[in-house]
Amino acid sequence: MNQVEMTEFPVGKPQEALYGVASTPDGALWFTLAKGNAIGRLSPDGAVSRFPLPHTDGQPTTITCGPDGRPWFTLSSANAIGRLAPDGALRMFELPRPASRPFGIAGGHDGCLWFAEMAGDRIGRITIDGDIEEYDLPVKGGYPSCMAAGRDGLMWFTLNQAGAVGSISATAAPRIFPLGAADAAPVGIASDAQGALWIAQAGNGAIVRFDAGGRITEFPLHSRAARPHAIAADAAGNLWFTEWGANRIGRISEAGDLAGYELAAPGSEPHGIAIDPHGCVWAALETGRLVRLQASPRD
């Protein structure tokens, strides 16, 4: 495997709680400052821009590149979905029901954005124009968390407090699939090129592969206290994930081979993760830095 080079870019202050990160087709990195009440942009030339949000405490958390090539993000405390244009023009879409606490968000095959409502026990769908539909889940108190588009045309999500994943579409009712471990606490979810889903289980320090046939394979990490959080797939067949509790970025191949990369500063608290158009891996560190790793080819 080629040597992985890690480079950090200061983009915020530790007290601003840098959280989510997403890449757009122009090579820019967009990120959320959960306590800084702002969205930031790191351009390919290294310039940092900041876009304040019109809330005292909107708590922007997860961010993704939408089907329109623009950054879309959830505001957990403001109960809204936001979208930014490259020039900083902001649109906000308030959710129909209060205190839903939207969290995970991902683009779907239908050209819409799908999001998880942690406190609402619902999955939401928003069009590019801002029309919102919501779908009740059959599990109460499950804490729907992160979203991913599956190769099967469905949207998949984690249920953090139910130890399960679920699937849904605009025409298919939600289905729930327990992961088997009572302490799993799944958070991040991603789909690989073979159609399998990969889940970061923060509760028991493992990465799980959930294949198209429903078979579950668990890959324990070096420490059960690693607290894997976000996960993303690269084009080479690797899954990259943040280890919030272990101060590392992890990598797992489709065959289950694991590797880990220590962050330079102790207590960096990595959260969100994304892959840019050049195949580099980016992670958001709560210390106010983005770290870039040059993605290695498959072993």
Swiss-Prot record:
Question: Gene Ontology cellular component?
Answer: outer membrane-bounded periplasmic space
- Gene Ontology biological-process annotations: antibiotic catabolic process; response to antibiotic
Disulfide bond annotation, renumbered to this chain: none
Against Gene3D superfamilies, the record matches this protein to: YVTN repeat-like/Quinoprotein amine dehydrogenase
Family under the similarity heading: Belongs to the Vgb family.
State whether it acts alone or in a complex, and with which partners, per the record.
Answer: Monomer.
Report the EC number(s), separated by commas if there are several: 4.2.99.-
- The domain of life is Bacteria
Stated name of the protein: Virginiamycin B lyase
Is Repeat given among the entry's keywords? Answer: no
Q: Name the cofactor(s).
A: Mg(2+)
Residues bound to Mg(2+) are 269, 286
Q: Which GO terms describe its molecular function?
A: carbon-oxygen lyase activity; magnesium ion binding
Q: Which PANTHER family match?
A: VIRGINIAMYCIN B LYASE
* Alphabetical list of InterPro entries matching this protein: Streptogrm_lyase, Vgb, WD40/YVTN_repeat-like_dom_sf
Function statement: Inactivates the type B streptogramin antibiotics by linearizing the lactone ring at the ester linkage, generating a free phenylglycine carboxylate and converting the threonyl moiety into 2-amino-butenoic acid.
Q: What class of enzyme is it?
A: lyase
